[in-house]
A protein has these predicted regions:
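Pyridoxal 5′-phosphate
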Residues: 1-271
Length: 271
């Protein structure tokens, strides 16, 4: 909707689709964005770092240089002269960029083959990712006694929610903040938290403490963050995950919330 609004007002826009490729169906021909970027190493199963930049022909002349400026740079005076053996200025600009390691890009065909031959193809992957993320998110919410981030008033969130129409899910934790100025009216009031309310100035150290415990004690990682008066946990579905994995992280999240509620996070030496 934001992109369409920009288009109607003749405003150029860049779509940051970092998690797009490999997670949700994309048809850039139909979407026709002014600029689109995404990462292949997040969901397409290539090594890091491997990103893509899509620029329709109508806008390719707007990109003057790569970063860093490298071998393929063409000066303004020479652009459009067709002196690159049939290649456009845009192609030359990104054909060879300094000391960038091209190995991850060379893995894209193998990644696509793996997805088709081993995983059953794009549609099968998308369906499983969406299903496991949303069912898993509901399981975690049940374990910690909260809910999942979604639009209010939905009778069938799994089918109707735009927020949840992906392979990622955000689960509200039972930890709340007493002085968050951006309280969300669509979630319970922070005063309903079963634990003592935290201060927003403590949000970052609390999140860092919980994430450090995940790494040091449980050999895993997930992102905790404050939003709308509450602490949230962002989780992702993947082809190698099952519901039992979400039950596992849900119980860990519950334990960590209890430990924060007891004040253990204040023991800085434990971090």
């Amino acid at each position: 909707e934001t992109y369409q609004a920009c288009k109607e007002e003749s405003v150029l826009s860049v779509i940051d689709g970092a998690h797009g490729v490999g997670q949700i169906p994309l048809n850039l021909g139909d979407l026709s964005p002014d600029f689109f970027v995404s990462n292949c190493h997040k969901w397409l199963y290539t090594p890091r770092g491997c990103a893509l930049l899509y620029v329709p022909k109508r806008n390719q002349h707007l990109l003057r240089t790569s970063f860093p400026t490298s071998h393929g740079y063409t000066s303004p005076a020479d652009r459009g002269r067709g002196t690159h053996a049939g290649k456009t200025d845009f192609e030359m600009l990104f054909e060879f960029v300094a000391t960038v390691d091209d190995t991850p890009y060379m893995c894209v065909p193998a990644a696509l083959d793996f997805r088709k031959r081993i995983c059953g193809g794009e549609d099968a992957i998308y369906k499983y990712l969406h299903t496991i993320a949303q069912e898993g998110g509901d399981v975690v919410a049940q374990i910690v006694g909260t809910d999942v981030m979604q639009e209010p008033g939905l009778s069938n969130p799994f089918q109707e929610s735009d927020i949840r129409r992906c392979a990622m899910v955000n689960v509200r934790m039972p930890l709340a903040f007493k002085d968050d100025k951006e309280v969300n009216p669509h979630v319970p009031d922070p005063s309903s938290s079963p634990f003592s309310l935290l201060s927003m100035k403590d949000a970052k150290p609390v999140c860092e403490w919980m994430q450090s415990r995940l790494i040091m004690e449980y050999d895993t990682f997930a992102k905790f963050y404050p939003h709308g008066g509450w602490l949230w946990l962002r989780l992702s579905g993947q082809i190698y995950l099952e519901i039992e994995d979400f039950e596992w992280i849900g119980n860990i999240a519950r334990i960590l919330c209890e430990r924060v509620g007891s004040g253990e996070w204040l023991q800085k030496s434990r971090i």
